[in-house]
Amino acid sequence: LISTEDRYLLDTNVVSETRKRRPDLRVGVFLEALRADQMFVSVMTLGELRKGAETRARNDREAAEELSRWLERMKEAFAARVIPVDGEVADRWGRLSATRTRPVIDTLLAATAIVHDLTLVTRNTRDVADTGARLLNPWEQ
């Protein structure tokens, strides 16, 4: 388990912000202050990004291919810092999900952050605020 201080699990909305033509300055400042070894992503984030590329391919093949190339570079950059959904994360997700209905992926990310002692960096804090996960919303910094 990852248990070092100052380590962050980046939600899809944070990672995606870096691709925008005009990313939010607060998100950029937050990410630029971190070292690479402080940033982690879940396999679920990679899945959401792949879904985005495949969905875009229906309307804009060129943009989808560019997004796919970016995703491959990101996967290489994060290679040792991609966290799977393992048995312990799944168990924590089940416990969190039993307390009330929550978005599945957001709750899996909260469970991952709890199990690996990471701070979940997300814009979607409302749905997981009562999970016990440490949360940080860079849009509110």
Identify the meaning behind each predicted range.
Residues 2-6, 51-56, 65-68, 76-123:
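Active-site neighborhoods of divalent-metal-dependent phosphate/nucleic-acid chemistry enzymes
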Residues 34-36, 77, 115, 130:
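Short, well-ordered coil/turn elements that cap or connect secondary structure elements
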Residues 20, 51, 130:
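Phosphate-coordinating loops and pocket residues in cytosolic domains that bind phosphorylated ligands
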Residues 1-45, 55-73, 141:
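Short, well-structured N-terminal submotif of metal-dependent ribonuclease cores
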Residues 125-127:
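C-terminal structural segments of small proteins and small subunits
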